Regions:
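N-terminal accessory/pre-domain segments preceding catalytic cores
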Residues: 5-171, 260, 291-295
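N-terminal hydrophobic targeting signals that begin at the initiator methionine
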Residues: 1-2
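Short N-terminal helix-initiation segments at or just after the protein's N-terminus
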Residues: 59-60, 194-199, 218-219
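Secondary-structure boundary elements
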Residues: 148-212, 260, 268-295
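Active-site nucleophilic cysteine motif
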Residues: 175-179, 213-228
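Hydrophobic/aromatic-rich core segments of domains that either
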Residues: 219-295
């Protein structure tokens, strides 16, 4: 597996590419100031409530679907593979259930009918299922909470780091750039883990990433999304295809602009094509990005 990885931060809209000088936009120097947040302001999923999809192997709490998530946990350790299926229309997300403590899973496909299913064994026999009419109060909510792939808990080191590195910033653009720079400057690409990831699915562990200061594309993206969400900046981890290989990257929501795609980045006061993560790996990528999954 070639040492390339795709953590992309994008800070412009209206363009899906920026390869020519005519595409350059002026930096929005008048972007509105906004107050920062503290440790006590971080959003965490709520596992209270009595709306439970219950089986002998796992439970799914859907009491807070209006906030854009469900929580799920194993009832006991299992030698069998246990999966949670979340489906809306033709789009399906399968998650491994591996924890006896409740973990959040996003309802990121918008309002409408969702199917939840608990499955067991290699053949994934259905244990319990439920169809829900989901109406999310704020469409950005699924991208403001931790979840299985962007997992942080109260007291985790990443929460204090994320708050500290933006404490002098006056607006979200400054916060986004400082978080981006922190991730790129402090994490080294892990070649051995990249090889391991070709053999099995590795869920990002943010505590280990912070401790070891190494990771692969999935880890870079998860860490950056976590730091943004901790600061109330909606962000989503995206997995998909590039011209090189399957990767993970980041999209961020900018007030007044919307979701920003991974082809544009801000460099010293102008909008221009830039990929500092590829740059840090000494790899110049100018290809396409095709999103498949959003987390």
């Amino acid at each position: 597996m070639k040492k390339v990885f795709l953590l992309m931060l994008t800070l412009s809209c209206f363009l899906f590419g920026c390869s020519s000088q005519k595409d350059v936009k002026e930096y929005p120097s008048d972007y509105p100031d906004s107050s920062g947040y503290g440790i006590d302001d971080i959003y965490y999923p709520d596992n209270s409530g009595q709306k439970i999809l219950s089986s002998d192997i796992a439970n799914v709490n859907y009491s807070h679907i209006d906030q854009g998530y469900v929580t799920a946990s194993l009832n006991h350790k299992s030698e069998q593979k246990i999966k949670l299926l979340i489906r809306k229309g033709e789009k399906s997300y399968y998650y491994d259930l591996i924890n006896q403590n409740p973990v959040a899973f996003p309802l990121q496909m918008g309002n409408g009918k969702y199917y939840l299913g608990i499955y067991e064994n290699d053949n994934y026999a259905m244990k319990k299922s439920l169809t829900l009419d989901v109406q999310i109060k704020d469409e950005l909510s699924p991208f403001l909470y931790p979840n299985q792939l962007v997992d942080y808990q109260p007291g985790d080191k990443i929460t204090s780091i994320a708050i500290d590195i933006v404490k002098k910033d006056k607006n979200d653009l400054q916060r986004i750039q400082n978080i981006y720079n922190y991730v790129v400057d402090n994490i080294t690409y892990d070649d051995e883990k990249a090889v391991e990831a070709t053999q099995k699915y590795l869920i990002p562990n943010l505590n280990n990433i912070i401790k070891n200061k190494t990771g692969i594309c999935f880890d870079y993206a998860s860490m950056m999304v976590a730091m943004l969400r901790i600061n109330h900046i909606p962000a989503r981890l995206i997995c998909g295809d590039t011209d090189v290989e399957y990767h993970a990257w980041v999209e961020v929501y900018i007030e007044g602009e919307g979701w920003i795609n991974p082809d544009i980045f801000m460099d010293k006061g102008t909008w221009t094509r830039m990929d500092p993560t590829f740059a840090s790996s000494k790899f110049d990528y100018n290809g396409k990005y095709q999103a498949i999954y959003y987390y």
